[in-house]
Curated annotation (Swiss-Prot):
Belongs to the TFIIA subunit 1 family. It is found in: Nucleus. TFIIA is a component of the transcription machinery of RNA polymerase II and plays an important role in transcriptional activation. TFIIA in a complex with tbp mediates transcriptional activity. Residues 173-183, 225-236, 246-261 have a biased composition (Acidic residues). Residues 52-78, 91-197, 218-261 are annotated as: Disordered. InterPro entries: TFIIA_asu/bsu, TFIIA_b-brl. The gene is gtf2a1. This is Transcription initiation factor IIA subunit 1. Residues 62-77, 122-160 have a biased composition (Low complexity). Coiled coil: none annotated. One of its GO terms (cellular component) is transcription factor TFIIA complex.
């Protein structure tokens, strides 16, 4: 029984069961069977598009459609057995493919020390022969792996190949390119030092131009060699002598101590409660004070007074 017949049998069996359930169920009794037939044709068309079955109009289909209208008890047991045998054969083929892949990949690429120990041969051959055979097999495997890796590396870009397969250096640790790099680095260091020396020299020259050796700043004169200030400083005093200047703290800076202090004839020293102003007049309410009037001192608790503010 072919794979096409298995797929078609499954489709027709499902559709037959759906129709039987619709007939037996009161809720779905009014469902039209043409809808179920459309579902069947759509299913078969999808299988045909995917390539699971060869052609929908197969002569086996006509026989299968006739059997779909019949009840399940009228199907032959031989057809069931053929379908079951086909499914079992497919399962066995799948299991065999899985076991073969696992057995081949389990020992692939393992070193010799991880391989299972080999039994001695009963005909008296030495185990060294077996070990040599095993080493030869490992060498063959390694050669095959290297050839496969080299073929894979050829498909990679040149940058990746240079990283994965670096070129060994057989002419010694140092070569001319290394010496050239060292010389270039030394020349760069010397240039940097020369630049620093030139910068320091320029800074020192500028400092000497603007400052004298005592550290005083030299202010450049931009208004000519001779001006009025220079003449005043040099020619005051007749014959160009220096003008005597008064030192700080001399008598000229002191105030005249000979002037007498002003005499105050009348004064009041007290606290005030209120001061009101009317034009240039002041009305004051004093308390708790002392007043000096006409050469007499008088204490008071409260006092009122009027003054004219000039």
């Amino acid at each position: 029984m072919s794979v096409d017949s298995v797929y078609k049998y499954i489709v027709f069996d499902v559709i037959r069961n759906i129709k039987s359930n619709i007939k037996n169920d009161s809720d779905t009794e009014n469902v039209d069977e043409s809808i179920i037939d459309e579902i069947q044709t759509m299913w078969l068309d999808r299988l045909t598009q995917t390539g699971a079955i060869s052609n929908q109009n197969d002569p086996d289909e006509t026989t299968a459609t006739t059997t779909t209208t019949q009840p399940q008890s009228t199907l032959s047991t031989v057809e069931h057995e053929n379908v079951r045998n086909t499914l079992n054969s497919l399962i066995q083929l799948n299991n065999k493919s899985q076991t073969t892949t696992t057995t081949t990949t389990s020992t692939f690429g393992n070193p010799q020390q991880y391989l299972p120990p080999q039994k001695e041969v009963s005909n008296g051959t030495s185990p060294t022969m077996n070990s040599s055979n095993g080493s030869n097999n490992n060498n063959n495997n390694n050669n095959s792996n290297n050839s496969s890796n080299s073929s894979n590396n050829n498909n990679l870009p040149s940058s990746l190949r240079s990283i994965m397969n670096p070129m060994p250096q057989n002419d010694g640790t140092l070569d001319e390119s290394d010496n050239d790099d060292d010389n270039n680095n030394n020349n760069n260091d010397n240039d940097n030092e020369n630049n620093k020396d030139n910068i320091d020299k320029l800074i020192i020259d500028g400092f000497k131009k603007n400052f004298n050796f005592n550290g005083d700043e030299v202010i450049p004169q931009n208004d000519g060699l001779n001006d009025d200030d220079d003449l005043d400083d040099e020619e005051i005093g007749g014959g160009g002598g220096k003008v005597e200047e008064d030192s700080l703290g001399s008598d000229l800076d002191d105030d005249d101590d000979d002037d007498p202090d002003p005499i105050i004839e009348h004064f009041v020293l007290c606290q005030y409660e209120k001061v009101s102003r009317i034009k240039n007049k002041r009305k004051c309410n004093f308390k708790d004070g002392i007043m000096h009037l006409n050469g007499k001192d008088t204490l008071f608790n409260k006092a009122n007074g009027e003054m004219i503010w000039n």
